[in-house]
Every structure is written in structure tokens, then in C-alpha cells.
Amino acid sequence: MDNRIPYDDYPVVFLPAYENPPAWIPPHERVYHPDYNNELTQFLPRIVTLKKPPGAQLGFNIRGGKASQLGIFISKVIPDSDAHRAGLQEGDQVLAVNDVDFQDIEHSKAVEILKTAREISMRVRFFPYNYHRQKERTVH
């Protein structure tokens, strides 16, 4: 199954203005300098796999859905849970679960899929900007 989404189907998101690195940090030192970090790999999509025994909790909460037009986001991760150990964090956008697209899904349908699955393969990305916009809309 091809999980790529046509470019025209992506929502338009206006990001804050990019801030240039300080001029006093030489370009060859910017990657590892403690006052400037241009490492963006934390924002790339990643796969998180969880196994849930019958009757067990997933270890995280979600918010959002189709009504918010911003997607489904991880809103809470229980410390020391399997979800926490797998690397899920507040602000992760859930892109897909078990090959089901979560970018335009009703909240109730997303909850149903997550609660009924025993093995979960989630494609997520850390997207704090839209997560904070999501919280401002007070939908789920």
C-alpha cells in the first residue's frame, strides 16, 4: 500500500518566521554549538510499535480529529508506560495506525481503532506547532 499523500492534499500551515543563527557562531560550529541547534530529525515521521494485552491501557491519550481540521495528536503519555518507552510524546501527530490514515479521521473512529487493536503500528511525527493550535480549539 502506498502511504504517500499527493502534495495538493496537504493542509496549509503557516509556521513562525525562521530565525537565522547568531552571526557570532561560525557556520562550521553551528551543528554542535550549545546555543544553536539546527537538528530537525526530531520532526521527521517515525514508526512506533506497541503490543497491548486484552484489557490493558495503551498508555497515552489523544485529542483532535476531523472536526478540528488539524489531525489527531498525542495529548498525554503516561510515564513508564510502553508508549513512553517506545518514544511517544505529547505533541506527536498520529499520521496512520495499522495502515489506516489518521489525518482526516473522526475522533471516535480513531479511539475505536486504537482500543480494539492488539498490535499497533503508528506512523507519527512531532508537530508541536499544530498541537498547540489544536489545544486552542478545545475540540476533544
From Swiss-Prot:
Keywords: Cell junction, Cell membrane, Cytoplasm, Membrane. Pfam families: PDZ. InterPro entries: MAM_complex_regulator, PDZ, PDZ_sf. GO terms for molecular function: enzyme activator activity; transporter activator activity. The keyword Glycoprotein does not apply. SMART domains: PDZ. It is found in: Cytoplasm; Cell junction, Adherens junction; Cell membrane. Gene3D superfamilies: 2.30.42.10. Residues 47-129 form the PDZ domain. SUPFAM superfamilies: PDZ domain-like (SSF50156). GO terms for biological process: biotin metabolic process; pore complex assembly. One of its GO terms (cellular component) is adherens junction. It comes from the Eukaryota. Mediates docking of ADAM10 to zonula adherens by interacting with PLEKHA7 which is required for PLEKHA7 to interact with the ADAM10-binding protein TSPAN33. Interacts with ATP2B1, ATP2B2, ATP2B3, ATP2B4 and ATP7A. Interacts with PLEKHA7 (via WW domains) at zonula adherens; this interaction is essential for the interaction between PLEKHA7 and the ADAM10-binding protein TSPAN33. Interacts with SLC5A6. This is PDZ domain-containing protein 11.
